[in-house]
């Protein structure tokens, strides 16, 4: 029997809730727990835009949902296409701020690089996003809706334009912001992405990148079955202090110790990301130091030729220098890859995400 419910004064976005939280929400509305699971099964269907489409819910309950809640979408994104097939989306949020998301297609996969904050507080000196400053955290719905929008884009893309599959296969939290400074909302978004009734991605296809927020690393590993990437970029505190102010709070040795104790599955490895900056962190000596410091950490290493950005003083080394660095690490039995830069012509490459509005103001 339907209970008498007092309508909430402020509606909530149901896409901010995990399945467990949807169950709690349904129960607060006087409904059995399974109603929350039913709601989850509808929210992430691309064709569903209204509660009236949730046809296995009683009409009186659909009315109650509409009185107390809504579910958001990202419509009409700004879309830029790179020559190499990458697609950059600009999403305008309800408060007028804009975030960027990048789709990186390959023949066997579509990787979506998503943002977790508006701007970033970490002030890494080589990163355009760091120059924006920090505005606010993204909500779980604002994180997940980036994936929903890219999914819908791919589903509607003509077959002759597709480079990879017609769906998002991989998600990386490597866009604007520091995910571990928005841990609660990131964890909720991961729960939704990996929920079968949500977006049904496996945790092995999701990677969360951090510049080294040691205090939140263990909880991420305990609560989210995803991959971890560490933005390392230097092998000594002096250089890392200069490049990444976070190192003043969490020095290199403390970060690496947290990596050694990080809870992860047996076959999982941490990805260390290392931007190659000419004359700063690219010497053979630094390669040998890196090999020594990463001992006893199951890992692979991604070398990233620096994507030059206007107003920043850094340069990328030549490929000969990068290959020498890679060879030293390989001789020490590390798996080492050189990342191919994608989307440079639309400022969608690593470290280049910064909305035009903020760039013009800075």
From Swiss-Prot:
GO molecular function terms attached to this record: 4 iron, 4 sulfur cluster binding; metal ion binding; rRNA (adenine(2503)-C2-)-methyltransferase activity; rRNA binding; tRNA (adenine(37)-C2)-methyltransferase activity; tRNA binding
PROSITE patterns tied to this protein: RADICAL_SAM
Signal sequence extent: none
Enzyme Commission no: 2.1.1.192
A Pfam entry, by short name: RlmN_N
Subcellular localization, as worded in the UniProt entry: Cytoplasm
Reaction catalysis annotation: adenosine(2503) in 23S rRNA + 2 reduced [2Fe-2S]-[ferredoxin] + 2 S-adenosyl-L-methionine = 2-methyladenosine(2503) in 23S rRNA + 5'-deoxyadenosine + L-methionine + 2 oxidized [2Fe-2S]-[ferredoxin] + S-adenosyl-L-homocysteine; adenosine(37) in tRNA + 2 reduced [2Fe-2S]-[ferredoxin] + 2 S-adenosyl-L-methionine = 2-methyladenosine(37) in tRNA + 5'-deoxyadenosine + L-methionine + 2 oxidized [2Fe-2S]-[ferredoxin] + S-adenosyl-L-homocysteine
Family membership: Belongs to the radical SAM superfamily. RlmN family.
Task of the protein: Specifically methylates position 2 of adenine 2503 in 23S rRNA and position 2 of adenine 37 in tRNAs. m2A2503 modification seems to play a crucial role in the proofreading step occurring at the peptidyl transferase center and thus would serve to optimize ribosomal fidelity.
Protein name as catalogued: Dual-specificity RNA methyltransferase RlmN
Gene that this sequence comes from: rlmN
């Amino acid at each position: 029997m339907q209970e008498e419910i007092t309508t909430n004064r402020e509606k909530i976005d149901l896409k901010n809730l995990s399945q467990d939280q949807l169950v709690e929400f349904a129960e607060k509305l006087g409904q059995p727990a399974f109603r929350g699971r039913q709601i989850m099964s509808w929210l992430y269907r691309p064709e569903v835009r209204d509660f009236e489409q949730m046809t296995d819910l009683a009409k009186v309950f659909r009315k109650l949902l509409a009185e107390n809640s809504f579910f958001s979408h990202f419509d009409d994104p700004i879309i830029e296409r790179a020559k190499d097939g990458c697609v950059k989306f600009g999403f305008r949020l309800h408060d007028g701020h804009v975030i960027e998301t990048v789709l990186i297609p390959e023949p066997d996969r579509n990787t979506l690089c998503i943002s977790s904050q508006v701007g970033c507080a970490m002030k890494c000196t080589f990163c355009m996003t760091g120059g924006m400053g920090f505005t606010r955290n993204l909500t779980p719905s604002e994180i997940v809706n980036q994936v929903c929008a890219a999914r819908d884009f791919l589903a509607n893309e003509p077959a002759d334009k597709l480079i990879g599959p017609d769906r998002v296969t991989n998600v990386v939290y490597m866009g604007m912001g520091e995910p571990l400074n928005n841990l609660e909302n990131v964890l909720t978004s991961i729960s939704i992405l990996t929920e079968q009734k949500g977006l049904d991605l496996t945790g092995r296809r999701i990677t969360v990148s951090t510049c080294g927020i040691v205090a939140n690393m263990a909880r991420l590993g305990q609560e989210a079955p995803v991959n971890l990437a560490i933005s390392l970029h230097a092998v000594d505190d002096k250089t890392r202090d200069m490049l990444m102010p976070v190192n003043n709070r969490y020095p290199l040795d403390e970060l690496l110790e947290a990596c050694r104790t990080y809870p992860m599955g047996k076959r999982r490895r941490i990805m260390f990301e290392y931007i190659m900056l000419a004359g700063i962190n690219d010497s053979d000596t630094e390669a040998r130091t890196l090999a020594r410091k990463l001992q006893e950490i199951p890992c692979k290493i991604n070398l990233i030729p620096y994507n030059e950005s206007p107003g920043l003083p850094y340069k990328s080394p030549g490929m000969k220098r990068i290959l020498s660095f890679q060879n030293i690490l390989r001789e020490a039995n590390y798996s080492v890859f050189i990342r191919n830069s994608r989307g440079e012509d639309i400022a969608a490459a690593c470290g280049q995400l910064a909305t035009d509005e903020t760039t013009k103001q800075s």
